[in-house]
């Protein structure tokens, strides 16, 4: 298996899943600032020119792009991290789509307006931080009666946690959400999760409490965002 993640929630979803499933894989890191994700070779893997993507060398170099699709493929390939019965599978997919259609887009936009844009557009910041927090409360309420999102540990937990763990970076508080915090701690206690978020190794820490460091990291990421504003977004 070949994987092209980046130190970004969507990339971490795939690297965590690969570690949890104990699948051997080759990590290929693209230089996004140089536009390596837009080369003809990579566009054959993902026509949208974004990461992550995986190539299954055991299946005639079958390529999968979009992080959620990668997670589903890996789960179905191995028969792990997602039930095979219709109801169990549906529970996992519901919470996976909750992340893909809600948590990810809302937190992603909160990051952009709160951390990256040189101009501060407060209504946009308030909108995306507020919606992210509302979605956090949905998770907190559901986790009051469930150890993991679908009941048992799954790709849905991996997908949501990869984003929720960066709440500080988005400027969103998790105060008053004890069930969400319990789940976050449970996820972080898993060795494969800890290893997955180190793939690829990076000096960027989206959970830092050091505001000076946060500004430094934001400046590094801002260049990619500016590229995205010109129509060449990478993530």
What is the predicted role of each segment?
Residues 45-51, 196-200, 216-219:
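Short, structured secondary-structure boundary patches
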Residues 1-126, 130, 227-235:
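GST-like domain detector, emphasizing the conserved glutathione-binding G-site
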Residues 200-235:
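Acidic/histidine-enriched, glycine/proline-rich intrinsically disordered or flexible terminal extensions
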């Amino acid at each position: 298996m070949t994987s092209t993640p980046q130190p970004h929630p969507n990339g971490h979803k795939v690297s965590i899943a690969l570690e949890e499933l104990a699948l051997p894989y080759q990590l290929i890191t693209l230089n996004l600032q140089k536009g390596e994700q837009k080369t003809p070779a990579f566009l054959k893997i993902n026509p949208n020119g974004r990461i992550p993507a995986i190539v299954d060398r055991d299946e005639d170099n079958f390529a999968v792009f979009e992080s959620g699709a990668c997670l589903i493929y890996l789960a179905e390939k191995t028969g792990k991290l997602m039930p095979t019965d219709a109801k169990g599978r549906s529970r996992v997919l519901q919470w996976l789509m909750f992340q893909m259609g809600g948590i990810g887009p809302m937190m992603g936009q909160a990051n952009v307006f709160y951390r990256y844009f040189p101009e501060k557009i407060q209504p946009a910041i308030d909108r995306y931080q507020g919606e992210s927090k509302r979605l956090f409360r949905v998770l907190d309420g559901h986790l009051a009666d469930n150890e993991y999102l679908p009941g048992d540990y799954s790709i849905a937990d991996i997908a949501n946690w990869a984003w929720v763990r960066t709440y500080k970076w988005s400027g969103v508080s998790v105060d008053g959400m004890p069930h969400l915090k319990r789940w976050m701690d449970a996820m972080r206690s898993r060795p494969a999760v800890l290893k997955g978020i180190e793939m690829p190794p990076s000096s960027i820490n989206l959970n830092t409490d050091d505001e000076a460091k946060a500004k430094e990291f934001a400046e590094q990421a801002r260049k990619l965002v500016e590229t995205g504003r010109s129509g060449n977004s990478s993530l």
